Regions:
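Conserved short alpha-helical segments that host acidic/polar catalytic motifs at enzyme active sites
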Residues: 1-149
């Protein structure tokens, strides 16, 4: 996924990774990313772009380094990350998705016994194996859904 808020280059493309075995994909916009960036830099984070997604990934990495679970990290993010967004973030142990409490950005999940797929719209998943028997749903706003951790 290419950036839409910063320079449209491969450096600004998703997924973002700011920690070992961590990545984040983001659809939306953070209005407080500059303030959050300054706070994270004071804590030792290093950023390589002006992209708000890199700041969100840094927030996740910082929280995970303080021994928070991925689910707890994204739950805290609901109050700390101001904006409209859907985040998908993964670690070596699992992955999670969260939509902001207003749910301005679309998301759909297809869950089977063999896989979990997440996209902005169902059409992106229409040709997946066994999708017709999948549990398909829109994640509720302000709720963190996690798998494997």
């Amino acid at each position: 996924r290419m950036a839409t808020e910063s320079a449209i280059t491969t450096d600004g493309s998703h997924p973002y990774s700011t920690g070992k075995d961590e990545c984040l994909v983001h659809n939306g916009s953070l209005s407080n990313h500059n303030n959050l960036r300054r706070e994270l830099v004071k804590k030792g984070n290093i950023f390589n772009s002006e992209n708000d997604t890199e700041v969100a990934a840094g927030y996740v990495s910082n929280s995970l380094s303080n021994k928070k679970s991925l689910k707890d990290t994204l739950t805290s993010g609901l109050k700390d990350l101001d904006g409209f967004y859907t985040f998908i973030t993964g670690t070596k142990k699992g992955f999670a998705v969260v939509r902001d409490e207003i749910a301005c950005k679309p998301a759909v999940i297809a869950e089977t016994k063999n896989y979990v797929a997440i996209a902005s719209e169902f059409q992106a998943m229409a040709h997946l194996p066994d999708v017709n028997s999948a549990k398909i749903f829109e994640p509720e706003p302000g709720i963190v859904y996690s798998w494997g951790n």
